[in-house]
């Protein structure tokens, strides 16, 4: 693929922001405030730091590779084929589940805005069209995908930027005191709020999955991951601060905090601006899933871990077979509605991306001490160790059923790994030389 057709630095940043900023930011101010009051600003900053530690590990690992795969690739070279298989397959499965859920979420939100589209048949049609439409966009290659992603991401940020720029003049300082309201704060509130808000920062881990579609990924990916986290952190802090400053204690009782706050500032037009922003944001997250999901399967197929057909590309260099298979699975899940239970796997799966990558940074420093890196985390092993500890702590917060579903997912795919292992042992599969 020509370098001119690939994602440049700022397009990678926008791709990352699109993968992180979803509909959650339109709802989180209410949930966070109801748990811990205006101290939620401190919790959000705390989460930015700990999520940032994990993101820095991804940045350093990304500086060593140019292939697609991201966390799967890091696990393969640091921990071996078995853990790579578990990380890669679970990531692909969970992305399919997440895409189905997000497509239905978009259809549901559109139905709420347009009552005529709120019936089950309309939701099925809308979710199906959305998944198929975004798949077609991706099949036309990186140039088209880059343009669509840039357009969607900027469009989703405009309503949020307007909310912040206008809302900052309507902040009431008295709404920030007391920091810990007596009728809200109880023991354990900080941890509860920290877990809730942490997931608002997740999504950065998928940026490196499509490294081959990016200009100079060893240099640009680490910088883009760091820039994404900085911009998203500032955005989240500003949105929460304006929401608290405008609504005060009413923030704990509203179901649409950003929408209600903007309505209080500029009237009904503010509510509609946020509604449009919410729909665009949901569409953006769907696009991100459509873009990343096939590339996980393609990278594994190139290594012989999945059927070789999934590695096929068309004249636009798009992984069209993997894209079609992913889309079919997502549509069927969306129409069945069975993704709700399966989504429990995602809580555990996310940390199967984090832990191996954080460990990989430490292993790569020893294994490839002389290998050139465009980025190295300062402070020695301190930040990777903090990131590992954070991942374990967050995993410990998962519900028992989520842990069981995650463990079940790991076990179910074992026979497929055994099949791969037998073929590799027989010399039928060779390792991919490129990194």
Q: What is each stretch, according to the model?
A:
Residues 1-30, 34-39, 45, 51-52, ...:
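Membrane-interface "cap" regions at the ends of multi-pass membrane proteins
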Residues 5-16, 80-93, 126-130, 184-197, ...:
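Select transmembrane alpha-helical segments in multipass membrane proteins
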Residues 31, 35, 43, 52-131, ...:
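Hydrophobic transmembrane alpha-helices that form the core helical bundles
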Residues 109, 113, 132-136, 164, ...:
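Alpha-helical transmembrane segments of multipass membrane proteins
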